[in-house]
A protein has these predicted regions:
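A structural feature that tracks compact, well-ordered secondary-structure segments
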Residues: 82-84
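Short acidic, Gly/Ser-rich segments with clustered Asp/Glu that frequently serve as metal-coordination loops
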Residues: 78-80
Length: 259
């Protein structure tokens, strides 16, 4: 990031306007760190603006922030899942859980070890998830992988079934579904009713797993609206803020001072 900003500075010697998306629960120290990144190590005169990540997602999904009476967003990322409710132009409830794509990979590793006595790495688990991950019971596929035999310690090739992969994925999806249900129970009734009418917006890179929206719908009893932007939703929201002056209302600056 520093090298990219340094290159940009060579074309804009008077500084740039830099936008970051931040978690809702970011502390003052964490927010200050963004400014340090943008202006440290010989970088200078850059103005830093921040947009809360749920608001950026909402803008990307064309949710009318100022008039929304209650919209819920679920962003399933690599390491965590963020749950947020937006109403009257602000995030009123938000929390994150340590469950995402990487935890699914770990579960797949565990299932392969349990069913085949084979140790595989995170990259192999990720490839299996991408190739055979389906949150439905009709998926019947197989893939060959090479791993380390748990007993002999020697390399071994094995054919892995999609049911083994999906067992690991569904275990994590069950946790996410239970958290969403608990989250809705803590949401004010009138807002929860609006969310039930509108549906829950689903974004994030891990939302690419086929049938995840219907699976979570069965877990929670709510309908889900899957974003086709996936991992790009937050970036697309920032892009809209940069290009539209009216949307810059949702960005806030950091007080700048010499480091």
């Amino acid at each position: 990031l520093y090298l990219m900003l340094k290159r940009i500075e060579s074309y804009t010697p008077f500084g740039s306007l830099i936008y970051f998306s931040i978690p809702v629960d970011a502390t003052a120290v964490e927010k200050r760190a963004y400014y340090t990144v943008a202006n440290g190590r010989m970088l200078q005169n850059n103005k830093v603006m921040m947009v809360e990540s749920p608001l950026a997602d909402a803008l990307a999904l064309d949710i009318p922030l100022k008039t929304s009476k209650g919209s819920m967003l679920v962003n399933i990322g690599a390491q965590k899942t963020e749950l947020s409710v937006i109403a009257s132009g602000r995030v009123i409830i938000s929390w994150s859980i340590p469950m995402g794509g990487m935890q699914m990979d770990e579960k797949i590793i565990g299932e392969v070890r349990k069913n085949y006595d084979l140790n595989i790495g995170n990259r192999t688990a990720h490839r299996l998830k991408a190739a055979m991950g389906r949150l439905n019971t009709q998926s019947k596929e197989v893939r060959k992988v090479v791993g380390i035999d748990s007993i002999s310690g020697l390399p071994r090739e094995e054919v892995i079934s999609s049911s083994t992969v999906n067992e690991g994925i569904s275990a994590c999806a069950d946790v996410i579904g239970a958290e969403i249900k608990s989250f809705l129970e803590r949401t004010p009734p009138q807002i929860a009713y609006q969310i039930a009418q509108e549906g829950i917006y689903l974004a994030g890179g891990t939302a690419r797993i086929p049938f995840i929206e219907s699976y979570l719908g069965n877990c929670t009893g709510c309908s889900f609206r899957l974003s086709e932007l996936f991992v790009m939703s937050t970036i697309e929201g920032l892009k809209k803020v940069i290009q539209n002056k009216e949307l810059q209302y949702w960005a806030s600056p950091i007080k700048q001072r010499k480091l």
